[in-house]
Amino acid sequence: MLGDRAIAAGAEIRLGVVAHAIEDDGAGVTVRLSDGSEDRFDIVIGADGIYSDTRQRIMPEAGTPEYTGQAVWRYNLPRPDDLDALHAFNGPTGVGLVPMSSQMMYMFVTTPEPGNPRYDKAGIARAMREKLSGTAPQIRELAKGITDDEGVVYRPLETMLLYGAWSRGRVVLLGDAVHATTPHLGQGAGMAIEDSIVLAEELARADTPEDAFAAYRERRFERCRYIVESSLAICHGQIGKSPPVDNHAATTQMFEVCAQPI
């Protein structure tokens, strides 16, 4: 839907290419792409995720994402008839059941993973089932359906937050490129969408891109910091790195914070 709306608004979407060079001369930005083409723009927005190449190009001093010590496993399963909302099971191995349609749900499982191990794709379904061996009986029963290695999505949880500037010259960062959060409060995509709204507003009213970028960062930093740090506190509490956090209370507070104007 977002892609269709962008095209309808006049955007040109090019797939299968990446920026090989970003050169800001103060009057505009020249971008050379991996297919050999080159174009010039008024500004560049790096919305390219936690491993942002744009961030590395304009702020090599920004560092890299930090591994939290926890990972998440995901798998789609048939939805039980009585599952009509998110069901969460807390503990060192956390489990969530999330309805997706009248027929399907997905299960997510958070586990402590010291040392950031890697799991081979062959046998990863068995590994996920084994992670659930000490959970509640109903979860162990559902785990019997985790059989397809290709269906398992495993991700180490990493985080980062730029406490300084979010832009350099005519190039600005957005979303996970500047404030990557763990999923414990479910606000990663929401923060990126809010970023885009605020950035558009500030570009429309500012005299220069630099002024717009500074105002955008000023409006966004505290809320994004709150989400990143609060999510990480839940994560660390679950794996014993810090005191446990009351997930229900943290989620209630998050809804109150995110209901405020941006």
Segments and roles (model prediction):
Residues 251-262:
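C-terminal auxiliary extensions adjacent to catalytic cores
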Residues 243-248:
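C-terminal domain-tail junction helix/linker
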Residues 45-46, 128, 151-237:
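Conserved mid-domain beta->alpha element of the FAD-binding
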Residues 56-59, 186, 240:
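Short amphipathic alpha-helical segments
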